[in-house]
């Protein structure tokens, strides 16, 4: 097999593995949401809030692609479950921001702990240099996914 074919096969394998990982990730988060009594979109929206910090419902709608009405219902559910709070924006009292509260929820940490521990165990199989390369690759792949997400939203 020539280097070109070998490289091409490796690239195809990368695409297949990322598809597999993406599918397993979606299925895992669906199961996690169900275990928490949430819809998958609710759980991922709470995750977006944890990652990005407090934001308005409109900003959350832009990030998720959900309509205003859907975001309102989603925030209502998350607030009722104790995963977010609506607070007045300290910089503009006319605005309300959605504040994540999930980081302090022990049962969420407990739910994700085995996955975190398994991931850390996997990391221990690689050298620091290998991990830096892996993280660079995965980070760039995440950037590509973000770009493709934005493209699909247009």
From Swiss-Prot:
GO terms for biological process: regulation of DNA-templated transcription; response to stress. One of its GO terms (molecular function) is DNA-binding transcription factor activity. Pfam families: MarR. Residues 7-143 form the HTH marR-type domain. Keywords: DNA-binding, Transcription, Transcription regulation. Residues 57-80 bind DNA. PROSITE patterns: HTH_MARR_2. InterPro entries: ArsR-like_HTH, HTH_MarR-typ, MarR/SlyA-like, WH-like_DNA-bd_sf, WH_DNA-bd_sf. The keyword Coiled coil does not apply. CDD domains: HTH_ARSR. SMART domains: HTH_MARR (SM00347). This is Uncharacterized HTH-type transcriptional regulator YcgE. It comes from Bacillus subtilis (strain 168).
């Amino acid at each position: 097999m020539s280097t070109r074919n070998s490289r091409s096969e490796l690239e195809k394998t990368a695409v297949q593995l990322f598809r597999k990982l993406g599918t397993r990730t979606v299925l895992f988060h669906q199961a996690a949401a169900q275990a928490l009594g949430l819809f998958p979109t609710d759980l991922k929206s709470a995750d977006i809030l944890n990652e990005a910090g407090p934001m308005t419902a409109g900003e959350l709608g832009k990030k998720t692609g959900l309509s205003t009405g859907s975001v309102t219902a989603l925030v209502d559910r998350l607030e009722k479950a104790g995963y977010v709070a609506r607070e007045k924006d300290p910089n503009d009292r006319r605005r309300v921001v959605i504040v994540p509260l999930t980081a302090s929820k022990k049962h969420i940490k407990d739910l994700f702990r085995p996955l975190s521990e398994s991931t850390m165990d996997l990391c221990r199989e690689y050298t620091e240099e290998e991990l830096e390369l892996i993280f660079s690759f995965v980070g760039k792949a995440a950037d590509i996914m973000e770009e493709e997400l934005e493209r699909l939203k247009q």
